[in-house]
Amino acid sequence: MPRLHHYLSNQAFLVLLLFSSIASAAVVEHVLHIQDVVVKPLCKEQIIPAANGSLPGPTINVREGDTLVVNVINNSTYNVTIHWHGVFQLKSVWMDGANMITQCPIQPGYNFTYQFDITGQEGTLLWHAHVVNLRATLHGALVIRPRSGRPYPFPKPYKEVPIVFQQWWDTDVRLLQLRPAPVSDAYLINGLAGDSYPCSENRMFNLKVVQGKTYLLRIVNAALNTHLFFKIANHNVTVVAVDAVYSTPYLTDVMILTPGQTVDALLTADQAIGKYYMATLPYISAIGIPTPDIKPTRGLIVYQGATSSSSPAEPLMPVPNDMSTAHRFTSNITSLVGGPHWTPVPRHVDEKMFITMGLGLDPCPAGTKCIGPLGQRYAGSLNNRTFMIPERISMQEAYFYNISGIYTDDFPNQPPLKFDYTKFEQRTNNDMKMMFPERKTSVKKIRFNSTVEIVLQNTAIISPESHPMHLHGFNFYVLGYGFGNYDPIRDARKLNLFNPQMHNTVGVPPGGWVVLRFIANNPGVWLFHCHMDAHLPYGIMSAFIVQNGPTPETSLPSPPSNLPQCTRDPTIYDSRTTNIDLSY
C-alpha cells in the first residue's frame, strides 16, 4: 500500500504540473503593419519599409510555452516575408518565413498570419524580413521570458532593456542589391545614430539607470552585413545567454555579435554617478582588406542624479580588425550545464559533413563590365556549389507535394577537391574549377532524429572573412573553433563535449573552422546560409530536408490554407543580376 500511495502521489503531481503548464501558456496576438514610411536618421529623409511605423519595429514579448499569432499586413510596395530568427518552429515549418524556401512572399496589398508555439526556448531572439535587403529596416526583438512562476537562472534584474543595432544607408533600400557589400553611412542603436554623425548630435539612445541596480540588456545585432563590437565605458557586463540559450555567467568588458546574433547581459550600475558612453564598432574580419576609418556609434548611460553638464566617459574600443578579441569572446561562451532547457551533447554521430565555404567567381556576361577579381562577378559557395533560389514555387511546397524539377537532393558531404583551404593558389585546372563554383539548387536529405556533425571550413579562394552561418529550425552545439585547416585527428581531440554553447548563428573564423553538431528532430526544409545579406545573392547557402519520423506527431503537417501563392518574384536573390557596375 505505501508503494501504491507513493505512485498515485507522483501521478497526481505530474497531472497538476501538466495543468499548471497549460494554464501558464497563453495565445499572444500581434499585428505588423508593413508600410513605407519617411525617416531621417542622418541628414536626408528616406522612404523605408517599416513595421508599425517604427525603426526598429516593435518588440514582441512572449513566455515559453505560449502560442504566438502575428498577422502581417503588407501595405508596402515590396514583397515581404517575416522570419522568426532562432525559433525552433517544431512541426510549424510553414511559419518559418524563409522566402521561396518555406513560403512564397506576401505581395503588396495582401496579408498572412503566422502562428506557432514557443517551446523549449527562453531569452532574446529577433524577427526580420527575409526578402532581399528588407531586413535592413524590417526587424525587431523577440523576447521570450520563462513561464509564469519560473525564475531566471540568475538574480532578477531591476529592469530589462532591448538594445537593437542597425546598419543604415542614406539611399533607397532597393539600390542595396545593385552593388556588392556597399559601405553603410552609419550604424544605429535603437534607431538613433548618436553624436558621432552629422544631423544626429541630439538624437542618441539614452539608458537612465539607478546606482546600485542591475539591468538585463537584451542585445540584438540586426545589422545587415556587419559583426559589431559593443562596449560600455568603465563598466563590465555579465553575459548570461547567447542566441536565447543560457550560458555560464561570463564577465567581460567587450562583446561581439555577428549579424543575427543576440546576447543577454547583466549590467550593474556600480560606478560613480555620471554619464557613460556605450558604443558599437564594426569588426572588419576580411584578411588583406584595408581597414576604413570608422566612427563608433554611441548611446549614453545616464545615472540618476547626473548633472546635465557632466562629460560622458568614453570606452576604449578594439581596433576594427581585432581578431584576437573577437575570438576570445566567442570561444569563452559555454552553456549553463543543468540550466533550463539544457541538454547534453549527443556522443553518437550518424552523419558527418565537411563543408568548405567562401567567395569565388562567376563568369561576367559578354559586353558587361563586372567589378569582381579578374573582371568577373563575385559568387559564393558551400562545397563548391552556388545555391540558386527557386522562382516558381517554394522548396517546402515542392517537397511536400513531390513536385520535381525544383531542387536536387545531391548536396555532397565533402568538397569535390581537397586543397590547402587557407592558402589557395591558382595553379591547375582543378584550382580554376574551385574558383568558379557550380550553380545549382542542391540540398541535403537527413533522416529524422539523426545526429549531424558539420565541420565548416573557411577558404581563401577570395579574401577570407568571418561568415556568420545561420541554421533555420534548430540550435546546434558549437564544439570548437580554430584557425588554419581543420585536422580531423589533432583538432577533434580538442572539441568541447561537456558544456559547448548552443547557437543558431555562428561566425566561422577567417582562415579557420568551426565544428557544429545538432539533432535533426524537426521535419521540413530548413535553410542554412550566411547571415550577411550581401552574400545571399552570391549563393553561400544550402538547405537541409529533414525527413518525416515514424508517427503523425513526427511528420510534416499540411500547409495552411491561406499560404501565400507564388508569382514570379523579381526580388528573388539571383547573383546574375548583381555585381554589375551600374554608374548613376
Swiss-Prot record:
Residues that coordinate or bind Cu cation 4: 467, 530, 535
Location (main, coarse): secreted
Protein name: Laccase-8
Leader sequence segment: 1-25
Tissue: Predominantly expressed in tissues other than the inflorescence stem, especially in roots.
GO terms for MF: copper ion binding; hydroquinone:oxygen oxidoreductase activity
Organism from which the protein derives: Arabidopsis thaliana (Mouse-ear cress)
Cofactor note as given: Binds 4 Cu cations per monomer.
Localisation per UniProt entry: Secreted, Extracellular space, Apoplast
